[in-house]
C-alpha cells in the first residue's frame, strides 16, 4: 500500500497522533487507605496535561509540567496523579511519592504529628514498594520482549 494513501486514510479517519505517543500509567493500589495513586510516566507534557485534565483536575496548565515531576492531589475522592517524565532518578521518584503520601493521609483525615508519624512512614513504604515492584515488572517485560 502506498504510504501517502495510508497517511490520507489515517488523517481522514480522525486518527490522532496520540495513539503513537509513548506513555505508561501504573496504579499504586491503596492498602490501609482505600485510595489508589496513579503514576503517569511520559516525557510528552502535552499528553500529561490532557491526561490529568481528563482524569483529575481540569484546571492544570502546561506550566505545571515544567519541573522534573509533579503530584496532583486527590479531588473529590479521585486518585491523586504523579507525573514523571522518566523513572531514572530515584530521588525525584521519592520526592513525588512523599507528596502522594501526604495527600493520601490528608484525604484520610490523618494530620502529621508525633503520634501519626509511623502511619505516614508505612504509607510511604507501601507506595514505594508498589511503585518499584511495578516498574521492575515493566522493565523485565520490555527486556523479555526485545529478546
What positions do the PLM features span?
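A short, structured loop/turn motif at beta-sheet edges
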Residues: 93-95
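Post-HExxH zinc-binding segment in Zn-dependent metallohydrolases
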Residues: 112-145
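Active-site scaffold of zinc-dependent metalloenzymes
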Residues: 45-90, 100-104
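C-terminal motif of bacterial Sec signal peptides marking the signal peptidase cleavage site
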Residues: 13-14
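Sec-dependent signal peptide recognition
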Residues: 1-8
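Short, charged/polar N-terminal "headpieces" of proteins
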Residues: 18-54
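Sec-dependent signal peptide cleavage junction
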Residues: 19-23, 142-147
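Catalytic Zn2+-binding segment of zinc metalloproteases
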Residues: 97-114
Amino acid at each position: 500500500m502506498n504510504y501517502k494513501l495510508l497517511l490520507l486514510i489515517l488523517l481522514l479517519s480522525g486518527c490522532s497522533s496520540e495513539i503513537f505517543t509513548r506513555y505508561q500509567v501504573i496504579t499504586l493500589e491503596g492498602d490501609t487507605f482505600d485510595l489508589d495513586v496513579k503514576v503517569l510516566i511520559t516525557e510528552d507534557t502535552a499528553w500529561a496535561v490532557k491526561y490529568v485534565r481528563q482524569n483529575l483536575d481540569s484546571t492544570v496548565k502546561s506550566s505545571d509540567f515544567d519541573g522534573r515531576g509533579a503530584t496532583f492531589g486527590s479531588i473529590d475522592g479521585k486518585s491523586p496523579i504523579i507525573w514523571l517524565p522518566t523513572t531514572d532518578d530515584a530521588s525525584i521518584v521519592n520526592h513525588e511519592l512523599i507528596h502522594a503520601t501526604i495527600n493520601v493521609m490528608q484525604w484520610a483525615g490523618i494530620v502529621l504529628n508525633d503520634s501519626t508519624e509511623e502511619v505516614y512512614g508505612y504509607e510511604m513504604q507501601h507506595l514505594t514498594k508498589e511503585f518499584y515492584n511495578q516498574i521492575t515488572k515493566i522493565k523485565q517485560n520490555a527486556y523479555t520482549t526485545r529478546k
